Amino acid sequence: MIRAYEQNPQHFIEDLEKVRVEQLTGHGSSVLEELVQLVKDKNIDISIKYDPRKDSEVFANRVITDDIELLKKILAYFLPEDAILKGGHYDNQLQNGIKRVKEFLESSPNTQWELRAFMAVMHFSLTADRIDDDILKVIVDSMNHHGDARSKLREELAELTAELKIYSVIQAEINKHLSSSGTINIHDKSINLMDKNLYGYTDEEIFKASAEYKILEKMPQTTIQVDGSEKKIVSIKDFLGSENKRTGALGNLKNSYSYNKDNNELSHFATTCSDKSRPLNDLVSQKTTQLSDITSRFNSAIEALNRFIQKYDSVMQRLLDDTSGK
């Protein structure tokens, strides 16, 4: 049994490598060798690439077309058998589909294909004149539309949430000095906002791949002295005073703020930071609601696809049963 390429392309390739071409549906297709040669002549690269949004297991990226035998198996996997009755309805449908595949390969400007996308395009090209495929295409297009919107929202929400997290770290530091009625230095004696531990990370590489780090690396830096040597940090003042973030720059910043019962500048500073981040918090709530809505629509499209496939299989099975019973 060959596992579906949509779920895990690595498993699909592993299964294909274990079988002979002769065991695949399209091994005897009259156009198999022609399509293999066409892919080679057009320098089309088909690859499997790990996608963390789709794949549960990590695997190494791999160019499939480097292995001609494997390429032949991929094409034989989706190609149907030649029609027994030449000139009949099925044969005409099949020939039209193969013609579309050839036209697509010859005319498409894209020569770099991820396996999932290539297989989907080949499938639709082969069967584009069938009403069931038209319905499937509408559903899949809906899935892709909502999927793309969901991905963009996730990326935006990750950035917004990361900036809000940095503000929460700053607010916690301010509150610590407020509770002790002390003085906070936000310049050369500031905490280093580049410290991964502030955000709950223990691994430096994971932190460098985080949304927080991507924001912080755009910030200006302050040079401080540590044990007689220079070290660069991203101070609270660097972050708050920078334009390179969603909330923009906070102006007129001092190097330090002290607690004073009569004129509590530290408390005022805490309020200013809170006010600065409040619209960001509102935006995170708004985007979270939008993401929930778009995810619901995406899941509904998947559910519709599953229901359609189940219904289609049921109808086809009944037709086959009726035919065999005659």
Curated annotation (Swiss-Prot):
Record bears the keyword Cell wall biogenesis/degradation: no
Transmembrane segments: none
GO CC term (a single one): extracellular region
Localization in the cell: Secreted
Secreted in keyword set: yes
Superkingdom of origin organism: Bacteria
Alphabetic keyword roster: Plasmid, Secreted, Virulence
Signal peptide positions on this chain: none
InterPro entries: LowCa_resp_V_Ag, Vir_assoc_V_ag_sf
Physiological role: Possibly involved in calcium regulation of YOP expression, which includes the export process.
Identification of the protein by name: Virulence-associated V antigen
Gene: lcrV
